[in-house]
């Protein structure tokens, strides 16, 4: 049986009070629409259609060709939004899942279970429900004396008694596709908001003695919609808690989960320790037995095993096993550190390969460079890589020693076992096994201040 999905993402989100389209706000390092689309696709969907309106181009740019798109010019309600997908799905057979684009906490497992329940019961429609402590704003699930669904009533149309019901509609549904588009033609806007409600499709199915099921989730957080900045913060908090708990169950020690921010796509190996105030984001991969020190930020980077990082910023970099980083080091895009490399305090590395065993202990800038194995770069040493127009490369061979306060003016190559005297400004290549000294001879005038 074919499975389709429609993601509703046409609302402007005025309560967010933002120039940014609502579903493009981030939760746990990814936009809400990406979270929803990823989980929908992973639930076994063959075809995804996203309904766009305000900010359509931005949504298309975010999801790319992973989805088809239908445009809703006027926002006339959820049934009207779903109807826009008829250009892609009206002739299709099978099951169609309808999900709101502002529900980033919905899981693949719940969506799979919803669809399976729907298909196993040969239902024409199934609604995902939950129990809310505060159901205000949600449609209420109305059942008869035998517990069967009677209808879903929206907040503004509910009586006082109906508003006391705490079983709510999530706004997530599974439908028989042909029945869905047949009934959408019959939906009217006779309600307080003069909108075309998708839940009215369920009432129309029931009128024809069709089968409508309710699938209940015990986790209200999953179906929580995000309509303003407060709810965005709540979603972030819930997502962070979920992510951190999963890592801890997988063998990662997180000292203070409340202050630890780990993105949804980050992977961490067993017995790694994450200290308070750490932020790990993007597609970062952390190995085993590594210590990520407090207030470290790692983005889209690969960190090996048995690495120690103290209070540093690492972005789009690679760090091999047994390396030590920081405190207060910065690895910028293109930094590639080999095994047992040391990058100390106030060292910045950009677009450079630092080979195994090399040491950059403190106060250095290494840019557009290649540092050989076991080479030591002294305090205050700089690769002078930019002439105001172009960047140039510095190459330092293996087992070399760069004295303190040295300037290496690129393009330049220092051979293996080079020895550069402290305080030198080196502008010419240095052959291997050579000493280079480029500084003025010291002049001392004794008794000068007594004159």
From Swiss-Prot:
What is the species listed in this Swiss-Prot or TrEMBL entry? Staphylococcus saprophyticus subsp. saprophyticus (strain ATCC 15305 / DSM 20229 / NCIMB 8711 / NCTC 7292 / S-41)
User: Active-site positions, per UniProt?
Assistant: 362 (proton acceptor)
Query: Partners and quaternary state?
Result: Homotrimer.
Protein's job: Catalyzes the last two sequential reactions in the de novo biosynthetic pathway for UDP-N-acetylglucosamine (UDP-GlcNAc). The C-terminal domain catalyzes the transfer of acetyl group from acetyl coenzyme A to glucosamine-1-phosphate (GlcN-1-P) to produce N-acetylglucosamine-1-phosphate (GlcNAc-1-P), which is converted into UDP-GlcNAc by the transfer of uridine 5-monophosphate (from uridine 5-triphosphate), a reaction catalyzed by the N-terminal domain.
Q: What is this protein called?
A: Bifunctional protein GlmU
Instruction: Write out the ranges of the annotated region (N-acetyltransferase).
Output: 251-451
Q: Mind giving the lineage of the organism this protein is from?
A: Bacteria, Bacillati, Bacillota, Bacilli, Bacillales
Family of the protein in this entry: In the N-terminal section; belongs to the N-acetylglucosamine-1-phosphate uridyltransferase family.
Residues binding UDP-N-acetyl-alpha-D-glucosamine, per UniProt: 8-11, 22, 72, 77-78, 139, 154, 227, 332, 350, 365, 376
From the UniProt record, report the name of the gene that encodes this protein: glmU
* Keywords recorded for this protein, A-Z: Acyltransferase, Cell shape, Cell wall biogenesis/degradation, Cytoplasm, Magnesium, Metal-binding, Multifunctional enzyme, Nucleotidyltransferase, Peptidoglycan synthesis, Repeat, Transferase
* Cofactor binding, per record: Binds 1 Mg(2+) ion per subunit.
Q: Name the residues that bind Mg(2+).
A: 102, 227
- Pathway given in the UniProt record: Nucleotide-sugar biosynthesis; UDP-N-acetyl-alpha-D-glucosamine biosynthesis; N-acetyl-alpha-D-glucosamine 1-phosphate from alpha-D-glucosamine 6-phosphate (route II): step 2/2; Nucleotide-sugar biosynthesis; UDP-N-acetyl-alpha-D-glucosamine biosynthesis; UDP-N-acetyl-alpha-D-glucosamine from N-acetyl-alpha-D-glucosamine 1-phosphate: step 1/1; Bacterial outer membrane biogenesis; LPS lipid A biosynthesis
